[in-house]
């Protein structure tokens, strides 16, 4: 059983059902692997192995008594901005370094009820602000494909843990590309659902109108297994939409993959996604993937979308503005980090926030506060909201010509740790992904090749509520290619 970490969720569920191994053996295998190798990756902030092993034993007992939940006893892990009762929830920040949540996020509760066993909490950029996972108070995460390189962010710990074979699937959150970009950098699959599809209750907020929880897995099918229990209406979340979700797993398993399975499907490609800044090797992999989609029956059509430079500017006005508001609650009084021996209330506020927040979070709070200030609110924030509406309209027009839009996920492969210290350069990594968040659309990234030995991801974007279409389309591609099965040296 030395290669259990190579198995898909589907294979793990079958193995448990057929008694090829127990949940306890499975959790023990992954825990031992994490203890042995995560020193090189730093993907976990909190290892909750004792509780996981207890849950695995319970899962085995329940299965023996006839509990037939297919995912009962399958391991996974959570991004550390999802509240977990009795377990540290830090959001990668000194501000919450010792915060133990008194309740579970709805997502955490739903996943546990489906039978999954959580192994712990995964590293992330502080308060989900970053694209490389170098801003975490708990140290940078390393990419399993090259431990000298970044895994992407902000869900870098989640992506790295799946790519390293520490867990078969993991949760993440995506505000401007924080699932899709690390999925691309780490050579795995990741999906951001439609805004409102998955509950945000219990997810520590960065930008409330943009944040959405999603999943990582080796394949589209693995992502579907974890997304299925997460999706659905939650009355505790005011942004949750009361709309039935599809049976993602059943839809994929019923999909025909032989012949020309994508016949009749139109995939839109915009010239704006292939401009300056796109690495030539990345573009080569993307073009090859699009040709494969054509071979599978899809028709490639040209569409127009908002200039990515405009979406980038819009996002970096709106997201920091919302962050400025959301993070004002961390004042050293109610919860979170509190400075020592404050001279007065003003000193308590000032020092607690300046000592508790890292440089990138402080930068975005300042940017957001400036955009919201009385003299600039209309010139910046209000105008950005109007542009956001136009971005939504442009996507609607594009989808009149196609079923799915394809683009590179990131303009480059993973870069070296510490290499891109200029914040503006890091912000540019989100250039292809942020428009999706501004429009509230679902999108997925799946691996389609390599650039200089590093993974490259293709982004697929669909209409609102069409997660199943995305997953089925990626599954068809993955049924005819093996890029999603490529393994980093750490995993072989």
Curated annotation (Swiss-Prot):
Q: What are the positions of the active site?
A: 79 (charge relay system), 154 (charge relay system), 178 (acyl-ester intermediate)
Name of a matching Pfam family: Amidase
List GO terms (cellular component aspect). Answer: glutamyl-tRNA(Gln) amidotransferase complex
MF term (GO), any = glutaminyl-tRNA synthase (glutamine-hydrolyzing) activity
Signal peptide positions are none
Coiled-coil-forming residues are none
Alphabetical GO biological process terms = translation
Q: Which domain of life is it from?
A: Bacteria
What does the record give as EC number? 6.3.5.7
Q: Which reaction does it catalyse?
A: L-glutamyl-tRNA(Gln) + L-glutamine + ATP + H2O = L-glutaminyl-tRNA(Gln) + L-glutamate + ADP + phosphate + H(+)
* Record-linked InterPro entries: Amidase, Amidase_CS, Amidase_dom, AS_sf, GatA
**Gene3D superfamilies listed in its UniProt record:** Amidase signature (AS) domain (3.90.1300.10)
Q: Which UniProt keywords apply?
A: ATP-binding, Ligase, Nucleotide-binding, Protein biosynthesis
Subunit comment? Heterotrimer of A, B and C subunits.
Looking up NCBIfam families in the UniProt record yields:
gatA (TIGR00132)
Task: State its role.
Answer: Allows the formation of correctly charged Gln-tRNA(Gln) through the transamidation of misacylated Glu-tRNA(Gln) in organisms which lack glutaminyl-tRNA synthetase. The reaction takes place in the presence of glutamine and ATP through an activated gamma-phospho-Glu-tRNA(Gln).
| Similarity remark | Belongs to the amidase family. GatA subfamily.
Listed name of the protein = Glutamyl-tRNA(Gln) amidotransferase subunit A
